[in-house]
Amino acid sequence: MTNYRSKIKYKYVGIDPGKSGGIACIDEDGKMKAYKCPDSSEDMAILFEVIIGDTPPSNIRLLMERVWARPTNAVRAAFSYGTNYGQWLGIAASHEVKMNTAIPSDWIRWIGCPKALKSVIRKRWLKDKAKECYPKLKKITLKTSDAILITKYAKEDYFNEK
């Protein structure tokens, strides 16, 4: 019996939904690409279209970091974060791409980030980890590193398709 699933090539997309976040993808040939989040919803939609290209929606594995407002968030920051999150949800839905979400601690723990690092140190650690995982990828920044690692987590663990 032939395993047809193994012959299907998927495109993996990971999104860090913050305004200072990013979007990354591993294409059907295994090449990683990463982009900072555009400033406008129109540019977000255009970038999403470029990323998915002509890949059928059923062959796209999309994972976005699940976010929520916390008591320590300023109202304006929480609203901005939620706005971006909702825009990505709408963009994916308009392309009939199923949106999956994961809480930050799931992918951060999986990638091996030490516990109890302060935010700035953790962000630098994650950026360095993304560079270690994808040394040929140019311009890995604080804006793209989380999306890169979310995409890696999506492919290798969440969808379990190494």
Language model regions located:
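Phosphate- and other anionic-substrate recognition elements at nucleic-acid/protein interfaces
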Residues: 1-162
